[in-house]
């Protein structure tokens, strides 16, 4: 197993397009790191540079203590699992898993042992004689992972491995990959655009946009303490509610004035706005849907954060309900208990958890309070 280090790594294509910009990251041995971001943000390009499938334009990549910028992919001691499985259709599951070992001239008895061990880990033993066309999508993806496991690499790279699977299979395979990481204790770098995969699998998440790292943190910290507007909006579904608000300072308390409502902030958040000189300025106010309540208990205990709106859309998702409405001209979403009596057309009172309010600078989009 191995640690990785990327220092000032850049990728510039011949046409001048800068796909990855000054990428700096230290990955510890046995970490499960997720690269997440929208399409075209540079996450797969970064993974391919680590794999050696893309040249590094500038900067330094280390695997363990060795600089590998100019090392061939086959000599980096890594294994990659692709989105499209990349299985040989004419070979059996056994032969697909054994192929890389045969190329490396591993003894036949050792190949047999390694393939069968990997097959046992991934529950593929009954399928070893089958061809890929006789397998389901989830089984094919397990074969692709098995082919990587048998090599016993220092690092696993996974490029959107679950994106071709249906929703139910994706959940099953997420669990399988988590178990695999626990069992093998290996370093995994995993690329996805799916924030659910990122939040559930990663020990740390790297959020990217336009080739630039926005934030690197644990899933919980990313969700609760986003560093800017992009991270706050990208992580979480439904996404965070954003509204323009004007700061009005009264003594040592900062109020957010939104659509005629004045919401006093807690002392710690107030201090950051006051110290930052935001009195009278327009800021961006953010709050997650689960921190908007329609229950009487919250309405009674948080009277200063209460507002009224008319429900536009009601979505039932089993144990919870999404309520969609407007606050002034700003669209809002509340994630509430399924026992709510609110329905489209109803005028409903809502209360906010002021401790969970995020405030962002309107110009820089950086967080002011967390």
Description of each model-found segment:
Residues 253-255, 259-311, 341-370:
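Glycine/charge-rich catalytic "coupling/switch" loops of P-loop NTPases
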Residues 51:
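Helix-to-loop junction immediately C-terminal to a conserved catalytic motif
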Residues 54-62:
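Conserved post-Walker A/P-loop segment of ABC ATPase nucleotide-binding domains
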Residues 36-38:
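The feature captures the beta-strand-to-loop junction immediately N-terminal to the Walker
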Residues 73-234:
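ABC ATPase nucleotide-binding domains
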Residues 60, 66, 212:
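ATP-binding/catalytic-site motifs of ATP-hydrolyzing domains
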Residues 16-18:
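Short coil-to-beta microelement around the adenine-binding A-loop and adjacent beta1/P-loop entry
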């Amino acid at each position: 197993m191995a640690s990785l280090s990327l220092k000032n790594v850049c990728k510039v294509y011949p046409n001048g397009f800068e796909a990855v910009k000054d990428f700096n990251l230290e990955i510890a041995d046995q970490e499960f790191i997720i690269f997440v971001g929208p399409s075209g943000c540079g996450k797969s390009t970064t993974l391919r540079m680590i794999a050696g499938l893309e040249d590094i334009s500038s900067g330094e990549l280390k695997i363990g203590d060795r600089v590998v910028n100019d090392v061939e992919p086959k000599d980096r001691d890594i294994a990659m699992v692709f989105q499209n499985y990349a299985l040989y259709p004419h070979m059996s599951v056994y032969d697909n898993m054994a192929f890389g070992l045969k190329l490396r001239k591993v003894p036949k008895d050792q190949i047999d042992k390694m393939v069968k061990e990997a097959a046992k880990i991934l529950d593929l033993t009954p399928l070893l004689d089958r061809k890929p066309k006789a397998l389901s999508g989830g089984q094919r993806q397990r074969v692709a992972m098995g082919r990587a496991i048998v090599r016993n690499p220092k690092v696993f790279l996974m490029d959107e491995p679950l994106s071709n699977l249906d929703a139910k299979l994706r959940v099953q395979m997420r669990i399988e990959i988590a178990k695999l990481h626990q069992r093998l204790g290996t370093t995994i770098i995993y690329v996805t655009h799916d924030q659910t995969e990122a939040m559930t699998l990663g020990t740390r998440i790297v959020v990217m946009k336009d080739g630039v790292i926005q934030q690197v943190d644990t899933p919980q910290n990313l969700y609760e303490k986003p560093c800017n507007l992009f991270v706050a909006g990208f992580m979480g579904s439904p996404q965070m509610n954003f509204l323009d608000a004007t700061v009005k300072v009264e003594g040592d308390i900062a109020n957010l004035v939104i659509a005629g409502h004045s919401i006093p902030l807690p002392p710690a958040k107030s201090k950051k706005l006051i110290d930052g000189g935001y009195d009278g300025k327009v800021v961006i106010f953010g709050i997650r849907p689960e921190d908007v309540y329609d229950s009487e208990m919250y309405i009674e205990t948080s009277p200063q954060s209460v507002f009224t709106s008319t429900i536009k859309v009601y979505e039932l998702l089993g144990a919870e309900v999404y309520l969609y409405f407007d606050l002034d001209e700003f669209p809002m979403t509340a994630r509430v208990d399924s026992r709510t009596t609110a329905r489209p057309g109803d005028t409903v009172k809502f209360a906010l958890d002021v401790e969970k309010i995020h405030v962002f600078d309107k110009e820089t989009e950086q967080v002011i309070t967390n």
